[in-house]
């Protein structure tokens, strides 16, 4: 059991499967990682250089999870500031995309009433 980029990885798993447990690496990106490292190797066979390559690929082409969440929060705040329909629904804690709220969305309405 080892940690790469905060993800707990089992030593006997293939790199393709183990790398999908890291934030920001999905199935397609995992296949790219496997091809860059060369074939079907297991986590325990990785060298320090190969681990550094995985971390470099992870940070290179995509937005890390905290940046993504920050961007989503900024978008929501922008909707609220311009008082558009979606912003108002966010403020009220109600469904945004046309879902029925008369008999459904009870959980979100309970949070508002408290």
From Swiss-Prot:
Record region (Disordered): 92-114
Superkingdom of origin:
Eukaryota
Keywords carried by this UniProt record? Mitochondrion, Ribonucleoprotein, Ribosomal protein, RNA-binding, rRNA-binding
Write down the Pfam families for this protein, in alphabetical order.
Ribosomal_S13
Tell me the Gene Ontology biological-process terms attached to this UniProt entry.
translation
Supply the PANTHER family for this chain: 30S RIBOSOMAL PROTEIN S13/40S RIBOSOMAL PROTEIN S18, SMALL RIBOSOMAL SUBUNIT PROTEIN US13M
Which family is this protein grouped under? Belongs to the universal ribosomal protein uS13 family.
Annotated protein name in UniProt: Small ribosomal subunit protein uS13m
Native source organism of the sequence: Oenothera berteroana
Q: Which gene encodes it?
A: RPS13
């Amino acid at each position: 059991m080892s940690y790469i980029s905060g993800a707990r990885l089992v030593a006997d798993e293939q790199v393709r499967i183990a790398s999908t447990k890291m934030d920001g690496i999905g199935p397609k990106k995992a296949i790219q990682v496997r091809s860059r490292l060369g074939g079907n190797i297991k986590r325990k066979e990785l060298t320090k250089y190969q681990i550094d390559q995985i971390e470099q690929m992870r940070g290179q082409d995509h937005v890390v999870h905290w940046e993504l969440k920050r961007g989503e929060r900024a978008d929501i705040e922008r909707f609220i500031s311009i008082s558009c329909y979606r912003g108002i629904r966010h403020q009220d804690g109600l469904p945004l995309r046309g879902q029925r709220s008369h008999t459904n969305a009870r959980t979100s309405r309970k949070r508002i009433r408290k």
